[in-house]
Amino acid sequence: MYSLIEDIKKLLSVMLPILVAQISTAGITFINTTMAGHAGSDDLAGVSVGAGLFYPLLASIVGLLMAGTPLMATLLGEKKPEGLPYVVRGGLLIGLVISFLFGAAYVLFIDDLLTSLTLEAEVAYVARYYLMTMVGVVFFISMIVPLRCLTDTAGSTSTSMKLFLMAPPVNAVFNYLFIYGHFGLPRLGGIGAGLATMLTYGFLLVLFLIVVLKSSALKGHEIFHSILVKRSDVKEYLIVGVPSGLSIFMEMSLFSLIIVFLARYGTDTLAAYQIADNFASLVYMLPVSCSMALTILIATAVGAHDIPLARRYKKAGFVVALSGAAMTAAMTVLFRSSIGNMYTSDAIVASIAGQFLIYSAGWQLFDAISTPIQGILRGLKDTRVSFVLMVIAYWGGCFPMSLFLDHVVGLGADSYWLGLVFGVGCSAMLMILRLVYVERVMDREALPSFAFFMHRKITHPAAVHAVVASNVKQAKELLAFPDLYMQFSKENKFVFQP
């Protein structure tokens, strides 16, 4: 008889280091914004514009490359550690390609992009060269993420936590040197914040390389002893990673678009939205960290063909995520005025932010359902359908509902926060349906009538292969994409033996 408490302890042992690493990464952005602000308003505005354009793309890139986590965890669960170097090299290759594409896009489109924004000359100058430094940031992060996937799965999540904890103080030192121009270095203002960020991630990459190369368990020498990459590994990396990256991009781009619609309500409303959004983003790190931990644990359990263990981790994940969300939501509502005053001394802005924070509490509760399920499905390498469901929830639910509440019902700026709550609620509902469907397939039950998407299979246990085979006929009748199924089956040459 297993103990739920023991499973929760195991989940927390993986999750908490991830949470600390996430907070450390957020600390870099906070330090950049704060120190650039002291350099001048133009520097702060330039950094804000550059960061607003860059970070949705960066989050998408990280989401894509984090696909290495379930791939490596599955290999470890299957007792096939010799496959780790190929997956890592595949991730590094994809990272190199992404870095090249981002650099090429900067050269080709930066002039037209900044012109279309009609920024003041000083702000545009800072934004241009801040984004230039981000080319280096993309390269370093694209190299770090596959190595982090390796240390989190084959090693311990505490390793990446310790390394990321070094980043904020290092970043602060570089900011001090380059933003303000101390010790004979040029005073670069907001551009210096970008340069400091690039150097910080370069420093982190060196640390990750040292850790990987010194550990025999991480097979560092085997990774860099050869440049051989398996096409199948790269393909699987992209199959799992691209939908995850696109899901993040679609979600973050919606948040950016909402700012455009809120602009007509004035500066105070925009500032209040930024406060509530920033605080909600900090709280969001809790379910995201839980989701990442669930991906590692469930992928490892599934790789070992231990489906009951995967179910136990799923249950522990919901307990942790919902308990955490209940506490953060209650604290958000109770201390909303204090939170607003912590960000600004403007009483009007703080009051509006307090109202927005009430809505964010509802958002947190729905996120505690949706985000862990995404981690569970990633652990099962089920990401393509999740991406489609996220698009439906946010762009088919949240965005239209926000516009309806604003322009038809006339609720004003509150419409967009209510729309976000509705969108996250739709996402939670759709994720639950998807998880129920996947579990019914794994339980050898007939496909439910709402199974409008097929259960994608790549390298799951033989029992699951057999279950999928037994439902092929019914699945093809329910699916809107039978040709895609046939193409996938031929490419992977599945042989099912029920």
Label the predicted regions:
Residues 106, 149, 175, 179, ...:
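Structural signal for membrane-spanning alpha-helices in multi-pass inner-membrane proteins
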Residues 23, 27-45, 114-121, 177-188, ...:
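Helix-terminus/linker motif at the lipid-water interface of multi-pass membrane proteins
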Residues 1-18, 72-139, 185-242, 298-363, ...:
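Short alpha-helical transmembrane segments in multi-pass integral membrane proteins
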Residues 6-34, 38-39, 52-71, 96-103, ...:
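N-terminal transmembrane alpha-helices
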Residues 13-29, 133, 167, 200-204, ...:
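Transmembrane helical elements of multi-pass membrane transporters/channels
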Residues 44-104, 141-160, 259, 270-336, ...:
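Small-residue-rich hydrophobic transmembrane alpha-helices
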Residues 65, 134-152, 160-171, 193-208, ...:
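Short runs within selected transmembrane alpha-helices of multi-pass transporters and secretion channels
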Residues 20, 24, 28, 57-61, ...:
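Residue-level hotspots within pore-lining transmembrane alpha-helices
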